[in-house]
């Protein structure tokens, strides 16, 4: 009798433990991936194709530096098979959420892990931190493409050839992109390659394509540009005869407008050269809603305004 009772208790405990286990595969049978920025969402969609369901948290015009997870976001993350984010503190207010997901045994991946530390640009303010805007060098994005393909292939080995083929197609598109933007940038003399923007998002772009880059705000938009920042940048513009400055789709335009006013008040005319996509892509369904389309648009806007 005692032996039967022990077996019954063990059976109950086992049943309860099964009920408590999380079924990581949603009932639609697809492998669900939650991504953060629109750049990553677009990349994973290109590689994962029809074999995965991709849900991005951040849309067009959303600033990842300031983004906070809603209850709905936490629910999406908790029910994901995999989470893919940028890293290097780009999504600074989501770090604790990602750690929580890792404790729940959800595969949580930072695409910045694809890059060697020597390829990263260090922060001038914090010795152990790096510039998180890694997508603005296409070579970085190529490495990240390979990294994401490997992660998907490990998670779904039955589809690894499919992912590999999609990645190869996308890498070829990135190769063409590099050729096109290098050809367009070559039409702009090096002494005119001075890029002034709302915040320090374009350092990788500057390093790759020989631009001197100046941002009103630092690497993160979490801190506002002060009067000294505006005056210092205004002096730079006047000294180097910069023709145009740029606003960003994910950053309020008021700081750049204040900069323009400061420059114009000193008898030097500077125009707003256009809106660049920095921390987010354009609207879905538009060319700028893709990484490749965004990059082409930015380069065309920059070159035309600075010529």
Model-derived regions, located:
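Sec-dependent signal peptide recognition
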Residues: 5-12
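Extracytoplasmic metal-acquisition and chelation regions
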Residues: 21-307
């Amino acid at each position: 009798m005692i032996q039967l009772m022990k077996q019954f208790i063990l059976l109950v405990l086992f049943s309860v433990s099964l009920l408590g286990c999380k079924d990581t595969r949603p009932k639609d049978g697809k492998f669900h991936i939650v991504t953060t920025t629109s750049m990553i969402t677009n990349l994973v969609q290109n590689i994962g194709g029809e074999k995965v369901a991709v849900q991005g948290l951040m849309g067009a015009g959303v600033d990842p530096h300031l983004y906070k997870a809603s209850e709905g976001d936490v629910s999406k993350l908790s029910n994901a098979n995999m989470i893919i984010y940028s890293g290097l503190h780009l999504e600074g207010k989501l770090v604790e959420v990602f750690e929580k997901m890792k404790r729940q045994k959800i595969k949580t991946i930072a695409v910045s892990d694809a890059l060697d530390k020597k390829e990263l640009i260090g922060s001038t303010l914090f010795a152990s931190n790096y510039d998180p805007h890694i997508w603005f060098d296409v070579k970085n994005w190529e490495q990240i493409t390979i990294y994401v393909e490997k992660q998907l292939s490990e998670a779904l080995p039955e589809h690894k050839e499919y992912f590999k083929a999609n990645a190869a197609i996308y890498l070829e598109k990135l190769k063409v992109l590099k050729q096109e933007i290098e050809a367009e940038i070559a039409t702009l003399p090096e002494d005119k390659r001075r890029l002034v923007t709302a915040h320090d998002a374009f350092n990788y772009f500057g390093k790759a394509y020989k631009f001197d880059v100046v941002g009103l705000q630092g690497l993160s938009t979490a801190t506002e540009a002060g009067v000294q920042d505006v005056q210092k940048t205004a002096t730079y513009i006047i000294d180097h005869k910069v023709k145009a400055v740029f606003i960003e789709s994910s950053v309020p335009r008021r700081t750049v407008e204040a900069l323009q006013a400061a420059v114009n008040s000193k008898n030097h005319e500077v125009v707003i050269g256009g809106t660049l996509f920095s921390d987010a892509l354009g609207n879905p369904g538009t060319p700028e809603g893709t990484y490749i389309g965004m990059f082409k648009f930015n380069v065309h806007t920059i070159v035309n305004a600075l010529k």
